[in-house]
Amino acid sequence: MLDDRIRRIVGEHGRLSLDITQLRSDASLYQAGLTSHASVNLMLAIEESFGIEFPERMLRRRTFESVASITDAVAELTGERA
């Protein structure tokens, strides 16, 4: 499932202060400790994992705000169901 895959990547690359398994899909990753530097690493890991490139219009804080927002963006780019 797409959400599970995104959660795994966030858990590995997000450097969160909270356990990703404890966060709701709509919880703010920034409030959970995601920094701007970690968000770039997270974006690169997602791009590599899914073979995609985020277009400039998606390079916004709100795209990486939560697991749900990342999942929606990846679903849009890959055609997979969120």
Task: For each feature predicted by the language model, list its residue ranges.
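Phosphopantetheine-dependent thiolation modules in NRPS/PKS and related acyl-activating systems
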Residues: 1-35, 41-44, 48-82
